[in-house]
Amino acid sequence: EEVISRLKQENAEIIFVNQEQSEIPGTFWRFLVIDDESVDKFMIRDADSLISYKEKAAVKEWLNSGKYFHVMRDSRMHNELILAGMWGGYNGVIKNMFGLMKDYLKEDMDVNRISDQVFLRKRIWKTVIQSVLVHDSYHLGKEGKPYPDYEISDIEKIAFFHIGMIDSNSCTIKTEIEIKAKKVKWYLENENGEIICSYDSFIKKENGKQIIEINLPTFYSSKIKSNKWKISYEVLE
């Protein structure tokens, strides 16, 4: 509910799946945009992936290419034909995506964390390959081409940067809570005292101390380590 509330504050459109749609695995729900007749073009991304100038340049090149679909691979770990959170296309080419997903799941009952990508390989790639721009840093397939030049941001200078990276996995900040509590609202403040973000967290016990663990993007955590930014909090429970 908190996430939905935050999205609404940023004027995001929230679409709830219906009862029938909710019966397929949640990782497949994002593909339902392909059945939305109000959508002209779609880009499907993981909710926790980092948006970058490199991705922006790649998408711009796709939009100017005349191709119906766009696929990106940017890591040695990106070894599927279509990464479930790194592709896009024009609507109207793939028909009845929900039906395709239901039929596939009836045949393949072994649902796991990569089932969505296996579905894309087995059922969708044969359509996508007919008109696709593939950006591929490691040339998984002959259809891949290099990424265009792009503006370099600070985050794109780190050694492990790639499109689709989950940047908040790279650093966990532990903050001691000195007041006895069960739950706090913490704030990330910059050098000017401005609030960058704020979330609720439950207290954990570690070595006799009360702490909260916060996963932050590399850029944010580096600011804390250099004592330029700080974490403050208020007790909720």
Can you name each region flagged by the protein language model?
Residues 39, 66-67, 181:
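Short, high-confidence coil segments that cap the C-terminus of an alpha-helix
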Residues 47-49:
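Short acidic donor-binding/metal-coordinating loop in glycosyltransferase active sites
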Residues 2-41:
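Active-site-proximal specificity loops/subdomain of glycosyltransferases
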Residues 33, 69-71, 86-88, 119:
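Conserved hydrophobic/aromatic beta-strand scaffold that supports enzyme active sites
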Residues 51-82:
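Conserved donor-nucleotide/metal-binding helix-loop-beta segment in metal-dependent transferases, i.e.
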Residues 76-79, 89-231:
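Catalytic core and acceptor-binding pocket of nucleotide-sugar-dependent glycosyltransferases
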Residues 27, 31, 56, 116-118:
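Conserved glycosyltransferase catalytic-site signature
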